[in-house]
C-alpha cells in the first residue's frame, strides 16, 4: 500500500495574455530572475484588493506557478483567497491592466478593484 498523497491545488491560473505581458515586462527590465508576485491586501471599498509586483526572491512558503518560462508566486497569506482564481491581462479603451477573476469573491466593488469573501 502506498503512502497517501496530499493534493495542493494550484492557486492561480494564468492566461496566455497575462503570460505574454509578464514576459514582455521582464524583457524590458532585462532581469530574467524576476517573478510576478500576486497578492491580496486589506483595502478598497469591499475589504480586500489585489496587488501585483515583480520580485526576485521567493519565500520558502510561497506557492510557485511556472509556465512558459514565467514564474508567478503567491504568498501563504494570500493563497487561500486566490485558489481557483484566474489572472488575465486586458487592453481596452480605459487602458490596460492585470485583472483577477476570483470564484471565492462573494462581492466586488463597482470599479472592480476590491472584493470581499
Swiss-Prot record:
The alphabetized list of GO BP terms reads:
iron-sulfur cluster assembly
Cofactor or coenzyme needed: iron-sulfur cluster
Which PROSITE patterns would you find in this protein's record? Answer: HESB (PS01152)
**Listed InterPro entries:** FeS_biogenesis (IPR000361), FeS_cluster_insertion (IPR016092), FeS_cluster_insertion_CS (IPR017870), FeS_cluster_insertion_RrpA (IPR023063), HesB-like_dom_sf (IPR035903)
Q: Which GO terms describe its molecular function?
A: 2 iron, 2 sulfur cluster binding; 4 iron, 4 sulfur cluster binding; iron ion binding
Gene Ontology CC annotation, any one: cytosol
The entry's iron-sulfur cluster-binding residues are: 45, 109, 111
* Keyword terms of this UniProt record: Iron, Iron-sulfur, Metal-binding
According to the record, cofactor stoichiometry and binding are noted as: Binds 1 iron-sulfur cluster per subunit.
Which parts of the chain span the membrane according to its record? none
Similarity comment: Belongs to the HesB/IscA family.
Subunit note: Homodimer.
Checking HAMAP family in the record gives: Fe_S_insert_ErpA
Function of the protein = Required for insertion of 4Fe-4S clusters for at least IspG.
Name of the molecule in the record: Iron-sulfur cluster insertion protein ErpA
Amino acid at each position: 500500500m502506498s503512502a497517501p498523497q496530499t493534493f495542493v491545488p494550484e492557486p492561480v491560473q494564468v492566461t496566455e495574455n497575462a503570460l505574454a505581458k509578464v514576459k514582455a515586462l521582464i524583457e524590458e527590465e532585462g532581469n530574467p530572475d524576476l517573478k510576478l508576485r500576486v497578492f491580496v491586501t486589506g483595502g478598497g471599498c469591499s475589504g480586500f484588493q489585489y496587488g501585483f509586483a515583480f520580485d526576485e526572491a521567493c519565500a520558502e512558503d510561497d506557492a510557485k506557478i511556472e509556465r512558459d518560462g514565467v514564474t508567478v508566486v503567491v504568498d501563504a497569506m494570500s493563497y487561500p483567497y486566490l485558489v481557483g482564481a484566474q489572472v488575465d491581462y486586458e487592453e481596452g479603451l480605459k487602458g490596460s491592466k492585470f485583472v483577477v477573476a476570483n470564484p471565492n469573491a462573494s462581492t466586488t466593488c463597482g470599479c472592480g478593484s476590491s472584493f470581499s469573501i
